[in-house]
Amino acid sequence: MVVFSKVAAAAFGLSAVASAMPAAPPRQGFTINQLTRAIPKRTINLPAIYANALSKYGGNVPPHIQDAMAHGSAVTTPEQYDVEYLTPVAVGGTTMNLDFDTGSADLWVFSNELPSSQTTGHSVYKPSDNGTRMSGYSWEISYGDGSSAGGDVYRDTVTVGGVTAPGQAVEAASHISEQFTRDQNNDGLLGLAFSSINTVQPKSQTTFFDSVKSQLESPLFAVTLKHQAPGSYDFGYIDQSKYTGELTYTDVDNSQGFWMFSATAGETDFDAIADTGTTLIMIDQSIAEDYYSQVPLAFNNFFYGGWTFPCSAELPSFTVTINGYDAVVPGEHIKYAPVTDGSSTCFGGIQDNQGLPFSILGDVFLKSQYVVFDSEGPQLGFAPQA
């Protein structure tokens, strides 16, 4: 009985301490919608979009694509051809329109360290009163079209939806190339790949998602990109109203820092990366050739740097099988854009991966799917959009 009394007393004491402690904040789930607003026309360079995706993954940009960048452009708006999807994010108190990118792990932004001539039309990060510069830390990025950016690193408050990372690494641009300054819709990038590939030197930093996932109901986010319309990101929960049927899950190999998984197209097995920061589907040459063999007058057009076809063509759908689930991309999504403004020749949304050891399933693929990025496993879940 003495032992029982001691245990009871201890239990009572623990319960009293617990009741005196503040309750842990409830875990959250929230949805952040992408922008829907009028955006003026701007010039996009289709071969440059292709080249940037290749160089992002360490691939070589062939000479014919480099040559095509010199004359390949189309005057359009981002919504019309789904070049990029932008999402509002509060960075150090400034609301900025960022590109959410599951193919990289950096959060970089236009900053007040840039000359005013390079920030026209952009929201600019200014460190908050709580923001601190990380002495000796820096970052640098470059892409296949010659664009580049780099600068200093700060710790500051970053808020997406209702969730805040109070000491998030923010990569503030102090120098930036003209290609970025011309895109006045985009104030930077928020990476959602794995923190292991963050490029900050001398020590990589944690992504926003890794910083806040303990605050979420579940350590996941789900992506609903739309064809020629704004989509949404669900953080911490799965919205069953956004897909039909059941989710099919597949294991992720994150050894290279990406959301990589196994898939099949036709009779060909391949590894693929789900990348919201890449516009196109970039796949094995044989798969691209098999697909375009079904499209009259389609060919690998060296002048324009990739597969083209008559804009009047009716394109077949494209199917990627993932752990038994057939993810179907409608042909209209693959008819990406005219090679120049008003042209009757269109640039394909499926292109050759130029020998990369994996394929990239970018927005052309993702905007027909509801995709769950689950850090437990890790794993990916796929279902058709509702």
Swiss-Prot record:
Gene Ontology biological process terms from the UniProt entry: proteolysis
InterPro entries: Aspartic_peptidase_A1, Aspartic_peptidase_AS, Aspergillopepsin-like_cat_dom, PEPTIDASE_A1, Peptidase_aspartic_dom_sf
Induction: Expressed, albeit at a very low level.
UniProt enzyme class: hydrolase
Glycosylated residues, chain numbering: N130
Keywords: Aspartyl protease, Disulfide bond, Glycoprotein, Hydrolase, Protease, Secreted, Signal, Zymogen
Record flagged with keyword Signal: yes
Positions of the propeptide segment: 21-69
GO cellular component terms given for this protein: extracellular region
Protein task: Secreted aspartic endopeptidase that allows assimilation of proteinaceous substrates. The scissile peptide bond is attacked by a nucleophilic water molecule activated by two aspartic residues in the active site. Shows a broad primary substrate specificity. Favors hydrophobic residues at the P1 and P1' positions, but also accepts a lysine residue in the P1 position, leading to the activation of trypsinogen and chymotrypsinogen A.
Protein name listed in UniProt: Aspergillopepsin-1
Gene name as annotated: prtB
